[in-house]
């Protein structure tokens, strides 16, 4: 079941949870979507700024499996 997160802070807190399994990064021409899989929901954060997306990618937790999609 999907849920959308609108704040970067909330997304980082969700990514640090112990039930967070993996992060998928989908890049389109106008935005970047970060999808974090937790036990119950798939949380999505949509960012339109490419620089913010790069910074967020750097600040993801190191133990999380990160997969980049086209």
From Swiss-Prot:
Top-level taxon in the UniProt lineage: Eukaryota
Swiss-Prot/TrEMBL keywords: Ribonucleoprotein, Ribosomal protein
Biological processes annotated in GO: protein-RNA complex assembly; translation
GO MF annotations, alphabetized: structural constituent of ribosome
InterPro entries: Ribosomal_eL38, Ribosomal_eL38_sf
Record's GO cellular component terms: cytosolic large ribosomal subunit
Presence of keyword Ribosomal protein: yes
Family of the protein in this entry: Belongs to the eukaryotic ribosomal protein eL38 family.
Protein name: Large ribosomal subunit protein eL38
Annotated organism of origin: Branchiostoma belcheri
Protein encoded by which gene: RPL38
